[in-house]
């Protein structure tokens, strides 16, 4: 329709001249044409008023599409989109983006994309690929990419999963260019360019052009254009004066036509048909024939695009609107037809161009004839006016001819003219269109209209040319700028190459920067433009240009001279082929490097058959010539003909085949033999290497997998024991917490009997108060607020301690678990390793030869690792023996000790050395005893490490523990006559070791030194043999040392008179010496007893039995020291502190039982009776507590003891040095405090004061008596255990209440009196055995302990020797568990560990010393002292008197002598065991009554008050 319609406008004139149908038919024709061709009909009636009205209506919708001209889109080509598509996309983008915006919103883009008819899923995928910056809006390159992808999808091509790298790079660079090219001021853009003064050189062209250019910039005012037309029409009529007469109607039609021109201009406000026609005229002035063709051709197709380029940015929208409507073509054709007629005289030139297109040559002749009449005159009038004149004249002719016979002419002419016209018009347009295609660098043909100024450029840029750039500007017309393409045309390339050769005088193949600068400045462009052009051309950035780069630069200059912009990036069309190839290669290399060299294979669309399906199979062999096939086939035929299966073979053929087969078989045999020999050599070489490696491994490695399995099994066994041990440890901590609260409770009751813990609200400070408490608080009298607060504090402290301990246990558990996990991870073998081990270590699942070789390797391993295996066995044996030793019952341990003692002196010495060594002597044990000692040492080490984890340091008592260890080993050898020497030595060692504790208070060093000298002579040999049992004793000693140090910190310092200080110092030195002697005596038997208590080898049990007892005994001893020697470590303060509280009860019991001098005697009786009843046991032979109890007694010392108990004492009786001498002698003669066995049997307390006298008296008995005493003691041991535990607990609790009175009464005697007491006490020893009741008292112990406990402590001082015997016996073990639960336990602990006995002894001397400093100690217990005196008389009501001094015992202590005796005896009470024996004495001892009478008559109590 469009083409035929255009043709109608062109074809009217010639035929109308020949055929002139009548006008009525013309009218019919005009109406009939519209029916077939709507637009042509309008054109035909363009002179009528109706057409003028309909033309605007047809274009009413077109102007609504307004482009956003403010968008600054860089002129960059996207290589994957054609130039035509990119123009369309840009137009669509400009129309959719509102003014002021640079990007298209998501909603707008979705509306546009939905028009494509694709599914939302596909569009969503396209959006994901297009929205590169993920901003939700699309810039132009992204929008173009999205439309391109839509086109792909519409064509059925699959969308790429990932945007191709090349596309992505181009789009991204386009986006960057947009972001960086924010529009600048136009004045800045034009600055330094030859276009800055356009008006100057445009004014030279002529007024019509300048007048037309002015309206073009402002928006094409129609008035100026119509005026020019009018002036042109004014001359036309003059030129056609003759015709005017003949065409009267034409004039009228002309007038109508002129009126039609005005509305035509109105309809084309935004379009520019008049400028196109005017330029057509201009074209005629340039070239005769070509110009007309150039003007006509472009206007017929996309005419609006030409004015768009020539006129600048303002013309672009005008050109695009008619392009989309398609309605302008008919109007333009009508306008162009007269142009052609107006140029009819030049038709010959046009015919040459249109030869292919015009099939009717008469058409041109008709034009010539018609225009010869007067059309040439109009052409001469002016370039613009004659065009319009011819146009109008043509219209007049058309109108006239239409009136005559238009009906047939259109049909015939329409068929011919459109073809010729349309063919030529697209030809010119299509030639320029390919220029936009990428990659056609240097191969683009010259556009039809030609490129303006090329020849001038060649002349201006020649080296010796004198022309200037102004000449170039004159030639460069904007009219033909639309023909300037992006790509370089062939003609351009030839011109630029000639220029390059002219400037490259040296034939170097390049032009350097200086020469290029001279060439480029000839263009007259500004510096800024030339810099941009150089940057784009010099792609290698080397400062010089080769031929292709020079051509690119010249082309950019040419474009800029034509008014086109310089691109920000070099478009694909201008990239030289060599550079493009290099860039593509580099991009592919970069991409391959990014992907790690892996070749990306994209899934191609299967719309077409893929070439891969026709490729050869790789499994096929390469090319094989036909000759080979022939040979192979012939050989196969021959072979087939000669096979043995063929029946037609002759005998010769068969023989031949046999020979051939034999030859082949022999050859195969030879090859097999060679291979076998080679493989054998390789196997032998490998075997030799394996042998060498195995030898190296055997010499340096361990058991490997076997050791791992053994260690893993051991780890699992150990891990199973950990939970039970931790549970026991938690139980011990719980018990300790409970016992500490009980201890505080008993202490508070002793201080205030009316205090009731049930009334104390432990939950918070604001507890409930009853009426009495409130009244007491109001009146300030009485009340138990202090006691309540102490109790609450004790409960809180116990809870916090328990929490801390439990936290430490948890930390230990977590540490153990982590260690276990780490070890198991390293030791565990995977299934794969296990399989490999069975296969290659044991030879399972392999061939016989390999299995034999594996066996040989195993033999080699066994031969190479005998020493290691033995050492491993030894270590495992030693570990198992140590583990066994931990579980050995006390009987076994005692047997070991007995055997050890019976061993020869050499054996003993070796044992000592072995024990002292750190496990090094494990292989040198000659007896079970030595190994048992080693096991104990190992246990001690483990205990020390565990205690360190709990935060308890054991370094302080380490040397002491070693010495005690030596003592324990040496004491068990009573068969030799060395006991006196051993005990003496031990006595020397202990005083020195106890020096630190003695330092706590001022000590009379003279006494200590003298005592050390006297004891050293007797006990020298004792130290070394006792080293074996160091561990357990050292642990307990460490516990006590730590506790004493803590108590020292808690005790407030008290100041006293100088006399008091001296007395306390002397007493303390004596106390420490006595303590050391008692400890030495007890140390040997205690180690076995501890083992007995440790029957379960669990760590928790051991810790419970050792740590709890040690702490309590330390507390008891320290309290005794503090209370008896108030000067430096005042006892009152110690009593208030919790750690020291457990010791106070024992001290109180000792001090509150002054009337118990007879108790020692009584205690010996039950021991002897039990000994006679039960046969001697061999395991107790070496135990000093079980030796013969019937030994000669030193009557002098016994009498001294009696005097001391009765209160008749000399001034010097209290000297500790004498007591310690007697103590030293006792163990020497009795071996191990035999007198203690006589006095107290199996009791576990260790009163050091009496122990000293008893030991001194017992030193004289013969060896036979020692053995008898040991046997009797062993028999009595079991019976006394129960009594001890019950009596000690109860007695200790009661003794605390009565502690102060006894102390106050005993403290008064002077040092001289004390010494006299000591001398008198010696004779008292014989009486002690007599009064001791047998086991009978044991049952009574529970009931009497509350009141009786005080008496036992007193005798314990003087009966100290017997006390040690009890602790050494089995009883100590049972006591350990009981100790933690109640306060009394502390005393038993000392009994177990020789350490406790020592502390009790010192307290005795300290008590008298404390008299001078009564304020400190008595301050707390000052009130109680008075009561003790009265209760003493009521001996029978012992239970009722617990709060005060026990009935019978208290009386004697009240007297000065008795008090001194009591004070001396009190120290021994530190060990609970004496309490049990004393309880028995209390029930039926007459001596107690005597003591009571003495107590009642004593004045000590009065003094204390």
UniProtKB/Swiss-Prot annotation:
Pfam families: DUF1720 (PF08226), EH (PF12763), WH2 (PF02205). It comes from the Eukaryota. Residues 85-174, 492-581 form the EH domain. Residues 118-153, 525-560 form the EF-hand domain. It is found in: Cell membrane; Endosome membrane; Cytoplasm, Cytoskeleton, Actin patch. It is a peripheral membrane protein. Residues 1133-1175, 1321-1330, 1454-1472 have a biased composition (Low complexity). Residues 1474-1491 form the WH2 domain. Component of the PAN1 actin cytoskeleton-regulatory complex. This is Actin cytoskeleton-regulatory complex protein PAN1. It comes from Lodderomyces elongisporus (strain ATCC 11503 / CBS 2605 / JCM 1781 / NBRC 1676 / NRRL YB-4239). The gene is PAN1.
């Amino acid at each position: 329709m469009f083409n035929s319609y255009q043709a109608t406008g062109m074809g009217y004139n010639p035929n109308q001249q020949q055929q002139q149908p009548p006008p009525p038919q013309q009218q019919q024709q005009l109406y009939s044409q519209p029916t077939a061709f709507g637009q042509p009909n309008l054109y035909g009636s363009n002179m009528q008023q109706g057409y003028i009205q309909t033309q605007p209506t047809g274009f009413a919708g077109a102007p609504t599409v307004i482009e956003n001209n403010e968008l600054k889109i860089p002129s960059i080509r996207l290589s994957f989109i054609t130039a035509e598509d990119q123009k369309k996309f840009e137009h669509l983008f400009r129309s959719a983006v509102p003014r002021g915006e640079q990007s298209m919103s998501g909603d707008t883009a979705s509306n546009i994309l939905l028009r494509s008819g694709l599914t939302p899923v596909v569009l969503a995928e396209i959006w994901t690929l297009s929205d590169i910056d993920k901003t939700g809006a699309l810039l132009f390159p992204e929008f173009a990419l999205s439309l391109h992808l839509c086109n792909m999808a519409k064509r059925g091509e699959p969308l790429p999963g990932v945007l191709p790298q090349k596309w992505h790079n181009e789009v991204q660079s386009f986006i960057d260019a947009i972001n960086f090219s924010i529009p600048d001021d136009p004045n800045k853009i034009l600055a330094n360019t030859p276009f800055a003064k356009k008006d100057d050189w445009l004014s030279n062209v002529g007024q019509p052009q300048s007048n037309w250019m002015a309206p073009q910039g402002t928006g094409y005012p129609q008035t100026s254009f119509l005026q020019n037309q009018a002036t042109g029409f004014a001359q036309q009529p003059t030129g056609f004066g003759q015709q005017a007469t003949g065409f009267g109607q034409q004039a009228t039609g002309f007038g109508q036509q002129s009126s039609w021109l005005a509305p035509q201009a109105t309809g084309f406000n935004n379009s520019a048909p008049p400028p196109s026609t005017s330029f057509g005229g201009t074209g005629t002035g340039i070239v005769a024939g070509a110009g007309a063709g150039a003007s006509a051709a472009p206007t017929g197709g996309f005419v609006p695009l030409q004015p768009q380029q020539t006129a600048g940015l303002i013309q672009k929208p005008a050109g695009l609107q008619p392009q989309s409507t398609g309605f302008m073509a008919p109007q333009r054709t009508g306008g162009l037809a007269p142009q052609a007629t107006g140029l009819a005289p030049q038709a010959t030139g046009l015919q040459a161009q249109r030869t292919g297109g015009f099939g009717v040559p008469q058409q041109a002749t008709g034009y010539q004839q018609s225009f010869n009449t007067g059309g040439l005159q109009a052409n001469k009038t002016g370039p613009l006016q004659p065009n319009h004149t011819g146009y109008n004249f043509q219209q007049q002719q058309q109108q006239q001819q239409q009136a005559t016979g238009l009906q047939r002419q259109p049909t015939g002419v329409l068929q011919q003219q459109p073809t010729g016209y349309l063919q030529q018009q697209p030809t010119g347009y299509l030639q320029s269109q390919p220029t936009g295609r990428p990659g056609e660098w240097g191969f683009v043909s010259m556009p039809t209209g030609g490129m303006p100024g090329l020849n001038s450029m060649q002349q201006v840029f020649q080296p010796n040319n004198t022309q200037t750039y102004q000449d170039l500007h004159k030639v460069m017309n904007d009219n033909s700028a639309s023909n300037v393409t992006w790509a370089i045309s062939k003609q351009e390339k030839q011109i630029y190459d000639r220029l390059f050769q002219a400037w490259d005088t040296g034939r170097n193949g390049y032009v350097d920067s200086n020469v290029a600068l001279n060439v480029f400045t000839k263009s007259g462009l500004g510096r800024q433009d030339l810099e941009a052009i150089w940057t784009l051309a010099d792609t290698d950035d080397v400062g010089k240009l080769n031929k292709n780069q020079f051509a690119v630069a010249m082309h950019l200059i040419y474009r800029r001279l034509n008014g086109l912009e310089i691109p920000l990036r070099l478009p694909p069309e201008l990239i030289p082929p060599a550079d493009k190839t290099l860039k593509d290669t580099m991009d592919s290399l970069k991409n391959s490097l990014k992907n790690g060299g892996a070749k990306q294979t994209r899934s191609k669309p299967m719309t077409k058959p893929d070439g891969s399906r026709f490729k050869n199979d790789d499994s096929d062999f390469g090319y094989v010539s036909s000759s080979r096939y022939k040979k192979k086939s012939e050989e196969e035929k021959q072979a087939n003909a000669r096979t043995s299966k063929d029946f037609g073979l002759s005998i010769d053929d068969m023989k031949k085949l046999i020979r051939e087969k034999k030859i082949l078989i022999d050859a195969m045999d030879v090859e097999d033999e060679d291979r076998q020999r080679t493989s054998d050599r390789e196997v032998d070489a490998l075997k030799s290497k394996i042998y060498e490696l195995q030898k190296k491994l055997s010499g340096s490695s361990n058991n490997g997998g076997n050791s791992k399995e053994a260690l893993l099994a051991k780890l699992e066994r150990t891990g199973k024991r950990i939970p039970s041990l931790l549970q026991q440890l938690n139980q011990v901590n719980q018990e300790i917490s409970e016992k500490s609260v009980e201890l505080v409770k008993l202490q508070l009751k002793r201080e205030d009997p009316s205090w009731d813990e049930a009334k104390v609200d432990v939950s918070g400070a604001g507890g409930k108060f009853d009426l009495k408490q409130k009244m007491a608080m109001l009146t300030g009298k009485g009340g138990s607020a202090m006691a309540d607060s102490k109790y609450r504090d004790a409960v809180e402290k116990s809870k916090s301690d328990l929490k801390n301990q439990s936290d430490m246990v948890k930390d230990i558990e977590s540490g153990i678990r982590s260690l276990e996990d780490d070890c198991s991870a390293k030791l565990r073998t995977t299934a794969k390793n296990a399989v490999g081990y069975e296969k290659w270590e044991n030879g399972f699942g392999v061939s016989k030869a390999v299995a034999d070789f594996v066996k040989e390797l195993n033999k080699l391993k066994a031969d190479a690792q005998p020493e290691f295996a033995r050492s491993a066995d030894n270590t495992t044996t030693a570990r198992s023996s140590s583990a066994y030793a931990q579980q050995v019952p006390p009987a076994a341990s005692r047997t070991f000790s007995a055997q050890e003692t019976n061993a020869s002196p050499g054996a003993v010495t070796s044992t000592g050395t072995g024990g002292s060594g750190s496990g090094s002597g494990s292989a040198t044990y000659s007896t079970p005893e030595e190994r048992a000692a080693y096991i104990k040492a190992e246990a001690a080490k483990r205990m020390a490490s565990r205690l360190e984890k709990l935060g308890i340091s054991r370094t302080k008592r380490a040397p002491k523990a070693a010495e005690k260890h030596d003592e324990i080993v040496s004491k068990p050898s009573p068969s030799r006559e060395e006991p006196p020497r051993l005990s003496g030595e031990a006595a020397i060692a202990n005083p020195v070791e106890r020096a630190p504790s003695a330092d706590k208070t001022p000590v009379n060093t003279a006494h200590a030194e003298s005592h050390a000298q006297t004891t050293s002579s007797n006990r020298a040999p004792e130290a070394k043999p006792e080293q074996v049992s160091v561990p357990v004793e050292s642990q307990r000693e460490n516990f006590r040392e730590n506790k004493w140090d803590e108590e020292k910190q808690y005790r407030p310092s008290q100041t006293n008179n100088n006399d008091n200080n001296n007395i306390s110092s002397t007493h303390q030195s004596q106390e420490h010496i006595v303590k050391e002697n008692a400890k030495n005596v007890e140390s040997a038997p205690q180690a076995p007893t501890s083992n007995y208590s440790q029957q379960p080898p669990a760590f928790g049990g051991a810790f419970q039995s050792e740590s709890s007892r040690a702490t309590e005994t330390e507390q008891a001893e320290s309290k005794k020291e503090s209370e008896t020697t108030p000067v430096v470590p005042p006892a009152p303060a110690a009593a208030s502190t919790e750690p020291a509280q457990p010791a106070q009860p024992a001290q109180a019991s000792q001090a509150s039982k002054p009337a118990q001098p007879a108790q020692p005697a009584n205690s010996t009786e039950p021991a002897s009776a039990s000994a006679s009843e039960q046969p001697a046991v061999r395991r107790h032979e070496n135990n000093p507590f079980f030796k013969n109890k019937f030994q000669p007694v030193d009557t002098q010392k016994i009498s001294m003891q009696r005097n001391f108990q009765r209160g008749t004492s000399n001034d010097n009786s209290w000297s500790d040095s004498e007591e310690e001498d007697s103590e030293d002698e006792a163990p020497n003669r009795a071996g191990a405090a035999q007198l203690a066995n006589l006095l107290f049997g199996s009791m576990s307390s260790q009163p050091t004061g009496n122990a000293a006298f008893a030991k001194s008296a017992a030193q004289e008995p013969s060896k036979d008596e020692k053995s008898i005493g040991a046997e009797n003691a062993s028999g009595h041991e079991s019976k006394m255990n129960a009594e001890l535990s019950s009596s000690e607990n109860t007695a200790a609790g009661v003794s605390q209440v009565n502690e102060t009175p006894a102390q106050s009464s005993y403290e008064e005697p002077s040092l001289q009196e004390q010494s006299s007491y000591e001398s008198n006490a010696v004779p008292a020893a014989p009486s002690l055995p007599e009064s001791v009741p047998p086991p009978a008292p044991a049952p009574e112990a529970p009931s009497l302990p509350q009141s009786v406990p005080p008496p036992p402590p007193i005798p314990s001082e003087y009966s100290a020797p017997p006390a040690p015997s009890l602790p050494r016996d089995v009883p100590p073990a049972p006591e350990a568990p009981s100790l933690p639960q109640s306060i009394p336990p502390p005393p038993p602990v000392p009994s177990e560990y020789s350490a406790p006995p020592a502390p009790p002894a010192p307290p005795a001397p300290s008590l008298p010393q404390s008299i001078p400093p009564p304020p400190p100690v008595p301050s707390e217990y000052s009130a109680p002292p008075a009561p003790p005196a009265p209760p003493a008389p009521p001996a029978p009501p012992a239970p009722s008197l617990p709060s005060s001094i026990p009935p019978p015992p208290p009386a004697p202590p009240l007297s000065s002598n008795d008090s001194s005796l009591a004070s001396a005896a009190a120290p021994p009470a530190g060990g609970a065991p004496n309490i049990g024996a004393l309880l028995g004495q209390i029930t039926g001892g007459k001596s107690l009554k005597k003591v009571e009478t003495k107590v009642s008559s004593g004045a000590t109590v009065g003094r204390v008050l």
